[in-house]
Amino acid sequence: MENLNCAPLLQNYRQAVDAWVNAIRAEEALAANDESMVAMEQWDTAGLHVHDTELTAKKARDLYKNALRKKNYGF
């Protein structure tokens, strides 16, 4: 099998997941008793950020998993 260093990909994945979790927490914090239009728009914007960070985390996960497959199975 190949001698690949997967550590940077793992680090990128962990950072992406941390960003995703932080985005979820930020969105959750905006779900408050404030029923104004401004608060709702901020909450919606935070939800879009959650979606974007989720996609980034999943892409980082896939890159890491593919590197592990290449390292362990040769493909």
Where are these regions (language model features)?
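Solvent-exposed, well-ordered amphipathic alpha-helical segments
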Residues: 16, 23, 70-74
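Long amphipathic alpha-helical coiled-coil segments
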Residues: 31-42, 57-75
